[in-house]
């Protein structure tokens, strides 16, 4: 059996930055090759990169949000490409704008089926939500790390709200330890 940590895969990293200036989005969408701007549908320019695969949302306020990257390094690389492209258009972008990772979404597996009804009872109602008629997963809110773990009957997990990659490992270890303590894992 592999280490549980080996089952963790980052699915999405969301990071933000601020250019510290207002942007003319109509002009930006025209000048930025491949950018999409439909203000009736969404208030920002959507700028997609193929490598690293990501989408960057650029707002009039100068705020920038990058999503879709599969690693923290990739989100930083994507934003650096976006910043370089903006500089090429004559937009004054700091040499190293601050980038803040907002959310890392990971998937993982406990490598066995789970009895979500028993888990809901064992963990108690204070930290969980489980309404299988509305959603097939059990929602487990952790305080440390401050993440939300979705547990599914298949043993698969989704960990969201992480600020750094290690949070997913800590969350997976916590869930595994807690379910083992409760006698709910083989």
UniProtKB/Swiss-Prot annotation:
CDD domains membership: TBP_archaea (cd04518)
PANTHER family: TATA-BOX BINDING PROTEIN (PTHR10126)
Role of this protein: General factor that plays a role in the activation of archaeal genes transcribed by RNA polymerase. Binds specifically to the TATA box promoter element which lies close to the position of transcription initiation.
Alphabetized UniProt keyword annotations: DNA-binding, Plasmid, Repeat, Transcription, Transcription regulation
Source organism superkingdom: Archaea
Protein name: TATA-box-binding protein F
GO molecular function: DNA binding; DNA-binding transcription factor activity; general transcription initiation factor activity
InterPro entries the record matches: TBP, TBP_archaea, TBP_CS, TBP_dom_sf
Sequence repeat residue intervals: 10-86, 101-179
Family designation: Belongs to the TBP family.
Gene3D superfamilies to which the protein is assigned, alphabetical: TATA-Binding Protein
Protein's organism: Halobacterium salinarum (strain ATCC 700922 / JCM 11081 / NRC-1)
GO process annotations (BP): DNA-templated transcription initiation
């Amino acid at each position: 059996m592999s280490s549980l940590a080996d089952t963790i895969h980052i699915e999405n990293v969301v990071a933000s930055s601020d250019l510290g200036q207002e942007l003319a989005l109509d002009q930006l969408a025209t000048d930025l090759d491949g950018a999409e701007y439909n203000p009736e549908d969404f208030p920002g320019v959507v700028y997609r990169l193929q490598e690293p695969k990501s989408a960057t949302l650029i707002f009039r306020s100068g705020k920038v949000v990058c999503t879709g990257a599969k690693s923290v390094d990739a989100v930083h690389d994507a934003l650096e490409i976006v910043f370089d492209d903006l500089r090429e258009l004559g937009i004054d972008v700091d040499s190293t704008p601050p980038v803040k990772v907002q959310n890392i979404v990971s998937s993982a597996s406990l490598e066995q089926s789970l009895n979500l009804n028993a888990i809901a009872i064992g963990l108690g109602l204070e930290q969980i939500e489980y309404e299988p008629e509305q959603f097939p997963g059990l929602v487990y809110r952790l305080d440390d790390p401050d993440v939300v773990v979705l547990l599914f009957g298949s043993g698969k997990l989704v960990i969201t709200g992480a600020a750094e990659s290690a949070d997913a490992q800590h969350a997976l270890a916590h869930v595994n330890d807690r379910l083992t303590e409760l006698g709910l894992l083989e």
